[in-house]
Amino acid sequence: MSKLNSMVKDFLAQKKIAVVGVSDKRETGCNAGYLRFKSNGYQVYAVNPRIKSYKGDPCYPDLKSLPEKPDAVFILASPRVADQIVKECVELGVKHVWLHCMMGTKPGLAAATTSVSPRAVELCRKNGITVIPGSCPNQFLRPDFGHAMMRALWGLGGNLSVNS
C-alpha cells in the first residue's frame, strides 16, 4: 500500500470530520466533500465564519466553536485560512488534517486550486499531526466518475505521492 493510500485509509477511519470552507454562495468542491462524508455515515461539522448553516445543518465559525473535538479536519479554503485552521488543530489536539488540492499532491502544478500551505504542512508535521497535503477525499470515498478518473490520472502522472 502506498504511503498516500495508508494516510487516506487512516483519515477515513475517523468518525467525526470538520469540513472547513463550505459555502452558501454556490456549489463547491468543499460542499461536495461535506455531503459525501455525511452520506457515508460520518459525523460532519461545517466550518465557515461567514454563514450560520449549510443545508439545514449548523455551521460553525471555527474549530473551537464545535460541540466536540473532531477526529479529523478537511480543509478546502485558501492557504492563509489553512494556516489558521492548522493552528487550531494543534491547540485542540486534532491528529488528522487533509489539505485539498485539485491537482493531486503536487500543488505547484496549479497554485490557485490548492489549500496546501507549506507553513500548514510544516506545522502539522512538527506537532505530530498526520497531514495529507493535497488531493481530495472525494477521489477515495466512493468516488463518482469524475473523481475516479482524476485519481487514476494523477496516479499515473505521479501526482498522488506524499513526501515526509
Feature locations, PLM:
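Conserved beta-strand elements of the Class I
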Residues: A18-V20
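Mid-chain, well-packed structural core segment of small domains
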Residues: D71-T114
